[in-house]
Amino acid sequence: MAWVKFLRKPSGNLGKAYQAGSLLSLAPTVGLLNEPGQNSCFLNSAVQVLWQLDIFRRSLRALTGHICQGDACIFCALKTIFAQFQHSREKALPSDNIRHALAESFKDEQRFQLGLMDDAAECFENILARIHFHLVPNRDADMCTSKSCVTHQKFAMTLYEQCVCRSCGASSDPLPFTELVRYISTTALCNEVERMMERHERVKPEMFAELLQAANTADDYRKCPSNCGQKIKIRRVLMNCPEIVTIGLVWDSEHSDLTEDVVRSLATHLYLPGLFYRVTDENATDSELHLVGMICYTSRHYCAFAFHTKSSKWVFFDDAHVKEMGTRWKDVVSKCIRCHLQPLLLFYANPDGTAVSTEDALRQVVHWSHYRSGEENMGCGKPIIYKPDNSKENGFGGQTKQKENHKFQTDISSLNRSQMQTSGRRAPVKLSHDQREKIKDISRECALKAIEQKNALSSQRKDLEKGQRKDTGRHRDLVDEVLASFKSGSPPASDGFRQQGNPHLYHSQGKGPCKHDRATHESYTSGKVISSSKSQNLLVPGEKTTGKAKSDSGTGYETDSSQDSRDKGGSYSSKTKSRHRGWKPMRETLNVDSVFSESEKRQHSPRRKSDIGSRPRCSKDQSFNNWPKANPKQKGLMTIYEDEMKQEAGSRSSLETNGKGAEKNLSAAESRGPGTSWQMQRTESGYESSDHVSNGSASLDSPGVEGSGAVMDVGGGKAFSEHIKMNSHNMDSMEYISHHCKDHPEGFRKELQDLEADDKIHELHPESHVQIKSHLIKRSQIGETNDKLFPSASPQTLAREHVYQTNEHKVERPDRSKCSERHNTENSEGTGLPFHVDESSVAGKRVDSNETVSPSSLPSSVRTAGLKPETGPLMFWSQQNITEQGYSDNSLSRELTLLSACNADSCQMPKLHCHRSPPPLPPKKYSTASAPRLERVGLSPDVGVTEAFNTNPSSLPKHSLSPASGPSLEGSPCMTQERDKETIQVKQLAANSYPSSCSTNSFQPDQDSTSVCPNETISLTTYFSVDSCMTDTYRLKYHQRPKLYFPESSGHHSNNSLSQTEQVEGSIT
């Protein structure tokens, strides 16, 4: 035998002290007998590896109390054989005790019966499952947090999986589960190695975990939760830090010749974070495990390799035969290749691992029959017994056991559960007061975490109710969906995401019933439990997942472990089911927007520094639900998206789903610049599969936040910023009403003052013009690609929206004047000086229909002059998500519009008949009365000041205007004529550089032009999707003002002005 080598070494000291069962040997030479007809090699291999696992061996030695089941007690059988390993001097020991216990435990299922061959991987899993039941029988295997449970503290991997569709933004509910073995297909593993070799990458040992993850998720595509037709990969996140990780290799009978390739690809070190999509436990982020055991299969026979820690040598166990292989892993590889041994289970352990804590462990051995009778006495009803009444006392006296049982009844809580832990059945729980007190003592740490979770959940529910009261329109359906998810106890959809077949089928292992037929008896393997049964078995009151105890309140799902449930008894009877809810997925915290925003805050600190004053106060989803901000060290379910968002600037919008992906991808590729990437690529809400681009929310990756000069939120508040971000690509034409100017000559004179003042700004910022020009060129490229995507809205649709918007808000006119004046005054005080634009920059500007200009973003000279929206000339600008360059475009192009519009004789309005197709959801219905002749177009309130306006007071030219300089420009039509001449020159210059046949909608991605007859009256409207971040009164005042409309009186001048604008745009490009 191998131990003889120790005796023969002249330089070793083991010759004097070594004995076959001493502490020095740790029984490396003791084998397990497998007599003919027993077919116990699968069990012998599993037992040998468990004995060689230092963490398991020390933990089992430290645990003294358990629930004993007599002949069916696997815990007793293991302790017995481990004691024999330690003290016996026999070369081989019988494994009859544990074989009988295993057969007795699964007698009703006809598994692991005497004389029948079975699977070593299943045997290993079921041994761990039975150990859990012997230590903590009152706890669900998936929710066990007992510190003394070896199975879940050392072996179990607490995971959750989820799918997120990048096309439509929909996401599946997070599904938590527990794995004891992570199964990998050997075929997929070899394919991944081949792909790596094709990329000319060297297979390094530290990349082994990544290879396993790639092989585990290869071809594992699921359908989109919203049925958009996309195939998406599932992501699995590890929430705890197991000290022993078991990898199961699944061999296909058709590819059994891959033995050599698989063995050569194995590594002796496993980097735990690389095995999963993400790990949330801090201890798991740098956890590196060592290979200490391996079970192999060949020709209907099992054997094992184990690393002996004392001698640092690999030992080969083949039933009763034990042989040392050497200190090098190469020796094991050579043995496997030579004997054609197929690796079946790989055991990776933490070299610094320790035994389990015995703080909440049982102190005495309690027999199952007494434990069962104690349950009946407490009124739980007759349980389904785990073993028939002929169970033996195993040498313990009846009176002694009754005393211990009496004490045990007051020490632990009871569970009326099903007979088979692996059958997946659950039974009600009823706890007495004393038992409830014991549970509090056992799970103090879990209780603290539960209180935090409860507080966070309570605040989230209150915020959700507020958002529900505020919400109208299309978001009402979203609230219903969220609340339905809150009340649902079964997370997965019909497609399940856990409805997997048997993960490991060994066709070459003839061992009775096929494993696929027995898959329903397994509950510990992820592949053996379908989502329906898993979702129904997630709840045990007072308990949480192991990973949950180490994570914060952002994990996103609860297990009813709040303190009040313990105070009330934590019972799960029929009377309290309505009060104590089960696991509830909180998918609000999993939305793409909020996670993407948080990840950008952490990953792009230079952007944060540049826009401290301009950061949006909240994203769309955060304003709707008001969830707490995620901790930078968040370990919850939200983390599943963080890497996704680092690699890709937001998920694609639903345009791709609607058949517009090709054009959209092309435009997104052309607009990678810092000012345009977010305009054509949107991030939808994480749980909402929206088909409307107009309601997508912005993220911190948008250029409005990247800019360094934009100052947002001067006086508008969160509602303004939120509304502007969510109303994207809504573009309408600009109207300038000459009649209104004639009725208010004073306001017109003041506007002329503003024009002269604004003419100087380009002198102060010539570099801004260059930047804007290049930016507009990029926009034109996007427009040329996308101007064919959206058909124009029908006149009926526009007329209908015009009627409802007009009647909805015409009663608010007196208040609007005051509010507009207030915002203008605040913004004027914020800037503190008038601004000026150089007239020479007119030729380089155009009307940018993609940008937003609102009362708060008007030049400061207009606001200081006291010009109100009702008393001055009105302009209507399309709404767009705010960018810094958008501010500059607005401020510069407004001057051109007024120059082309204000003719000295008639001051007519240029008509730009561009219509936006509104989202398909119907608008809010109001009584449709006859529309008055005089209406107003609502100005979109903005909350920023343009970068171009932030000039130095010392550099202002001599044409600077102050509020007192207004009367000096009375009767200045000659100035207007001079400006018109300049505009004509601009027109001629543009005609030489750009064909006049080009229309404005070539620069407008989402627009299409329609020709309107002179006698046809169509109201130009903007569709506002209702947001939860504002009340109806707020929206009535600031977001949908009825517009002032006059029938077209001079078609010649309108066409003239339109042609001017088109040609100026042509000169820019």
From Swiss-Prot:
Transmembrane segments: none annotated. It holds the Pfam family UCH. Residues 414-424, 522-538, 552-562, 674-700, 850-863, 948-965, 1052-1069 have a biased composition (Polar residues). Zn(2+) 3 binds at C165, C168, C224, C228. Keywords: Cell junction, Hydrolase, Metal-binding, Tight junction, Ubl conjugation pathway, Zinc. Residues 598-620, 805-826 have a biased composition (Basic and acidic residues). Disulfide bonds: none annotated. One of its GO terms (cellular component) is bicellular tight junction. It catalyses: Thiol-dependent hydrolysis of ester, thioester, amide, peptide and isopeptide bonds formed by the C-terminal Gly of ubiquitin (a 76-residue protein attached to proteins as an intracellular targeting signal). Zn(2+) 1 binds at H66, C68, C73, C76. GO terms for molecular function: K63-linked deubiquitinase activity. GO terms for biological process: action potential; epithelial cell apoptotic process; neuron apoptotic process; outer hair cell apoptotic process; response to auditory stimulus; sensory perception of sound. Zn(2+) 2 binds at H132, C144, C149, H152. Expressed in the cochlea. Isoform 1 expression levels are 10-fold higher than isoform 2 expression levels. Expressed in the liver. The active site is at C41, H301. Its EC number is 3.4.19.12. It comes from the Eukaryota. Residues 414-438, 486-634, 646-710, 805-866, 946-981, 1046-1069 are annotated as: Disordered. Interacts (via the C-terminal region) with the heterodimer TJP1:TJP2. Belongs to the peptidase C19 family. Deubiquitinase that mediates 'Lys-63'-linked deubiquitination of tight junction proteins, such as MARVELD2 and LSR, and which is involved in the survival of auditory hair cells and hearing. Specifically cleaves 'Lys-63'-linked polyubiquitin chains composed of at least 3 ubiquitin molecules, while it is not able to deubiquitinate substrates with shorter ubiquitin chains: recognizes ubiquitin chain in position S2 and catalyzes en bloc cleavage of polyubiquitin chains from substrate proteins. This is Ubiquitin carboxyl-terminal hydrolase 53. It comes from Mus musculus (Mouse). The gene is Usp53.
